[in-house]
Amino acid sequence: RLRYFVRVTVTRGYASSLIKEQEFIVQVAQPAPETNTPVKMEVGIEECLHIEFEYDKSKYHLADVVVGKVYFLLVRIKIKHMELAVIRREAAGAGPNQHNESETITKYEVMDGAPVRGECVPIRLFLRNFNLTSTYRGINNKFSVRYYLNLVLVDQEERRYFKQQEITLYRAA
């Protein structure tokens, strides 16, 4: 986890040193992206499950709303429910010293029960409610923060079928 802080050390000759740290927040404002294309993808398992999902855009403001839909083209397995999760992946360091951390920010159920062919499930996720930061890619080849939308289908035998889609988050100027 990346953090910014000021550390003050008072060295005393007659006793141990005093050390105090104070964290602070750095906000990097960015202009809104000029192009923001929708994300549309078809995924599936041959002859078992075939879905098409769509998100209205690929780049979101931190207070934006993710709007989308999942359309079931073929359903031959018994789906129990469908979840949508926001995942943050942080990477710090380089080469063999790189440390990766993944955190599920939120997960919620968008559908309960078995869908039928032709069913369309709407998605609406308000990002403002979560503690998110902007996306950072390869800062000095030492640090990155990336976000993913993870769509998960769970069947009756608790098998999980998922598709992750990277999204970009930004803080408006």
What are these model-derived regions, one by one?
Residues R1-A173:
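C-terminal beta-sandwich interaction modules and adjacent acidic
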